[in-house]
Amino acid sequence: MNTERSAAGGSRRRALLILAGAALLVLALLVGVVVSLSSMFSADEPSSTYQGPPAATGPGADGGGAGGGNGPEAEAALAHAPMLEVPGQAALPHTLSTRSAGPPITLPQPEQASGVLVPTGFPDTEQGAIAQAVELTRVGFTGADPQVWAQAYDSMAEPGAAPAAQTPASQDLVAFRRAANMPRTGPTRATVTWTPTSALVKGSTDDGSYVVTCVLGELVTDYKGRVATGGLGNCLPMRRVGDQWLVASGPRAWVAPATWPGSDEAVSVGYRDIIR
């Protein structure tokens, strides 16, 4: 088994268990489900698919952007560059930072929003790549349903991109539903939504045709007005193909740190507010 991401996956897995535990507690309080939340916060379970990092010293280790060349090797280096590790509790709501990772990122509007599953038609800029990743994640995270993610992802993936089921986002949703005692796919008693708040560019190739971007938002579980919320991020390798940004062929991107938007941890990763 690959071990390239085990440490990052372990931290993120703890964050997902905490978020799912909060969601499950909301459901338990309302429908009388008898659960033991303590089991969710016990010793780390080994990740079955995440790969664990080398020392975080490469591009993206401090949350900053990076570049260097073009072609498959340069793209793989950007995708695989480690991200800052954060504790699982960093995903829960807590005090906002007085610091900033930089000015807000203004996102463009899509040229096509009707008749498509995921809005598309963003300009050939880094902001366009971020905006496309935001829309894909927003649609794909609806209901925290791995099947919905697969449909949205497949509609925007270049041939040769990592299969949807092998992406960290899909694994996150599977883990969240399992920990929250929800069915693997399909409707649930709760409404689960993801609202984008922040983003960063981890790096791009010199020609700008390949961009690794990470987006962060609030994952909200609502059951009849009772709400559990937390931060959940998603990193995607994006490639400019014709007049569109698509999820790039080649390796998947490093796991996005799960942080509460606007917190010190989010700022340290490099997340900046997004505006439209």
What is the role of each PLM region?
Residues N2, S6-A8, G64-A66:
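Intrinsically disordered, low-complexity regions enriched in glycine and serine
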Residues T3-S6, P146-G242, R252, T259-E265, ...:
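Structured, amphipathic secondary-structure segments that form assembly/contact surfaces
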Residues R5-D44:
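Hydrophobic single-pass membrane-targeting/anchoring helices
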Residues G32-A131:
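Juxtamembrane and targeting peptides
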Residues P72, A90-E111, G231-G262:
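Short beta-strand edge/turn micro-motifs at domain boundaries
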Residues S100-R178:
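Core segments of small alpha/beta cavity-forming domains
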